[in-house]
A protein has these predicted regions:
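Non-catalytic structural scaffold of enzyme domains
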Residues: 1-154
């Protein structure tokens, strides 16, 4: 499932399908923890935050989490819907305001928990503070198919 928000339905989908289904939030939280993360910031849509898929994934493995404050979250929503989905360049001041908010809350890593936010990583060459949920899913899907992932930045 290549949509973070759709993981709200993961348990029902996984139970109904005859094939294994990878869980992007759980895999991302586990990879963040394996990379030494103690508190994961969640950059995602309001829907993903309300669905609590990342919060639950973090809680289940003993990883602390934080979401941006109200104003910073409005900025993330604007980036996703008013900029990326409209084919516009991302206002990095808005993005950095959300990142600063997560740093202030003690996060040592942040998940790009919306597929559109992967484009920010690509275009702005974001550093190791960020873990891209789309990349995590791709890597785990490749491994599930018996192929070792190559070509990803670490």
């Amino acid at each position: 499932i290549a949509c973070n928000t759709a993981h709200y339905f993961y348990d029902r989908l996984a139970a109904a399908l005859p094939v294994p289904v990878l869980n992007m939030p759980r895999l991302t939280a586990a990879d963040a923890k394996a990379a030494g993360c103690h508190k994961l910031g969640i950059l995602a849509t309001d829907g993903t935050l309300l669905a609590e898929t990342y919060q639950i994934a973090c809680r289940d493995i003993g990883l602390e989490w934080a979401a941006p404050g109200e104003q910073a979250q409005k900025g993330i929503m604007s980036i996703i819907y008013d900029e990326i989905k409209q084919g516009k360049r991302v206002d990095m001041q808005l993005f950095n305001a959300a990142v600063d908010d997560l740093h202030a809350q003690g996060c040592d890593m942040a998940v790009l928990g919306c597929t559109e936010l992967s484009l920010v990583k690509r275009d702005e060459h974001l550093g190791p503070f960020f873990i891209d949920s789309t990349e995590v899913l791709c890597k785990h899907a490749m491994r599930a198919c018996g192929v070792e992932p190559v070509g990803f930045e670490d």
